[in-house]
Amino acid sequence: LIQNAVLRANRYMSALQEQRYIEGTNILEPEAFRSLVKAYLHAREKQLTECTLIQIISSDLTREEAGQKLAKLMRQSDYVGVFEDGRIYALLANTSAKDAQLVEKRFREEGFQCEIQEDIAV
């Protein structure tokens, strides 16, 4: 059931391929990102996968530059997106909160202020 939710989210993302990214960036639009995060959080609740969400609090870079730089610091299975609040988040698939601390450290070393989000409503 959870796997189906993730598959549905991925199909949804594929169907909206041209509309899912903020123009000129590799950052997922709020609706597409929210759908993906919901699927991963639901799967995590059912103990089918691990995932961690990191909020990027601030950076001296433009959103486009931040997205490009973050993508280079993450795996291909991870995602960069925004919610309606306009803030950038990184969704780390198959990553526990403990393991995400290493990614958070890497982000900080590259000039990003960030914070692991334990409880987030989507």
Regions found by a protein language model. Name each.
Residues 47-60:
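Short glycine-/aliphatic-rich beta-strand segments at the starts of folded cytosolic domains
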Residues 12-26, 116-122:
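Flexible, glycine/charge-rich interdomain/linker segments that couple
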